[in-house]
Amino acid sequence: MSWHVQNENFILDSTRIFMKAFHLLLFDGSLIFPECILIFGLILLLMIDSTSDQKERPWLYFISSTSLVMSITALLFRWREEPMISFSGNFQTNNFNEIFQFLILLCSTLCIPLSVEYIECTEMAITEFLLFVLTATLGGMFLCGANDFITIFVAPECFSLCSYLLSGYTKKDVRSNEATMKYLLMGGASSSILVHGFSWLYGLSGGEIELQEIVNGLINTQMYNSPGISIALIFITVGIGFKLSPAPSHQWTPDVYEGSPTPVVAFLSVTSKVAASASATRIFDIPFYFSSNEWHLLLEILAILSMILGNLIAITQTSMKRMLAYSSIGQIGYVIIGIIVGDSNDGYASMITYMLFYISMNLGAFACIVLFGLRTGTDNIRDYAGLYTKDPFLALSLALCLLSLGGLPPLAGFFGKLYLFWCGWQAGLYFLVFIGLLTSVVSIYYYLKIIKLLMTGRNQAITPHVRNYRRSPSNNSIELSMIVCVIASTIPGISMNPIIAIAQDTLF
């Protein structure tokens, strides 16, 4: 008799759980419709790969790109809707989160055509590559909208695991294996440190895990000014620092950039920073609301170290990928200025605007590197000497992207930095802005040094790689991504106002 009662109770409990899950999916699922499109695309990829032969490979690219474009479309249709919290407080949708999700989707959409020819030439497995890219994109999107500590931990782990696998995708390359091992070990350590910081906030707030509820809990327990908050702040800053890769948390960046496949580096160099910036902004601004002076000081130190070390060490590099790795460390220092300024002086708007331009500039430069590497098999900066004589289009495209990264007018990078530095100046961050201007001049030096090499290499200085350079027909997908990124790195500088207006509309 007791067995029947237990069995009935088990069935009733299971039914309640199922109905609750169904209710969440039915009423809250519409709030993650862009993410659901990506999940459907992932399932479709697996089904086609398991039921078709190699001749169906173009369909894999088409499905991946289509799911990303459809997800962007769904996101744009949802723009300006009222902020909503769903899935029992795990996820929040608002304009601020959605614009970062849009940036991540944009990165992935541009990276897939950039990878097609590279994958075919290196004979890598295409299905797994696309699965990892889409899953990492999904993790980044969930991280942008994460509203509690569990989601903030699980979402970046989803992104990070795919990143580790992508960085070691060329298994026979010793450098790739080394890069993956360093990336994995440091990623695991940083995740542990991040969770330890979360545990401090969880205890101090009286057992709360939602971001806004943590603030209320700290007020109720009167612990918002306790030393434990400072300890939690340090641990969380170190954990997030690995994702953003500012100095001194940058040690993994150059090795991973150099050892990983170039399309993977292009993908990781932008998506990881976009997702981490969105998460860092919400974590610092909400749970650490009462410790703004402390986290401002911490981020100011990180920004100064990043801008100085990143740009100075980039001067000495001989590899294009390592140079862009150190350049990205300097670039994240500029982005941190926007995080420090906050919403009061358009800091977030300037950060988002600059991030949009950074995506086009960085992906454009990496598209040029992928194309040059496929045609010559080298990554050395000196081997680019005299490229203009063989391929003026590629040389000019790379030059424009590098000049935009350096912040020369009238390119998009100049206006992005100008807006960012102006907001920092208005907020009273005079020293940070001065360091930013000074290091921007340093970055222009090493970018111009490469451009001079591209344009003015004499016959005796031209390397065998460029001398034997053969330009392939201009119908490959890499050039498509490159053209889009080059245009986006130049034209938006002329029409900044609409972009700034959209960025200013991204409030919490």
From Swiss-Prot:
Mode of membrane association: Multi-pass membrane protein
Any GO MF annotation of the entry: NADH dehydrogenase (ubiquinone) activity
Reactions mediated catalytically: a plastoquinone + NADH + (n+1) H(+)(in) = a plastoquinol + NAD(+) + n H(+)(out); a plastoquinone + NADPH + (n+1) H(+)(in) = a plastoquinol + NADP(+) + n H(+)(out)
Keywords: Chloroplast, Membrane, NAD, NADP, Plastid, Plastoquinone, Quinone, Thylakoid, Translocase, Transmembrane, Transmembrane helix, Transport
Subcellular location: Plastid, Chloroplast thylakoid membrane
Cellular component GO terms, alphabetical: chloroplast thylakoid membrane
Transmembrane segments: 24-44, 59-79, 99-119, 124-144, 149-169, 184-204, 227-247, 295-315, 323-343, 354-374, 395-415, 418-438, 482-502
Keyword Chloroplast: yes
Principal cellular location given in the protein's record: plastid
Listed EC numbers: 7.1.1.-
UniProt subunit comment: NDH is composed of at least 16 different subunits, 5 of which are encoded in the nucleus.
Protein name, per record: NAD(P)H-quinone oxidoreductase subunit 2 A, chloroplastic
Protein's organism: Ipomoea purpurea (Common morning glory)
Organism lineage: Eukaryota, Viridiplantae, Streptophyta, Embryophyta, Tracheophyta
Gene: ndhB1
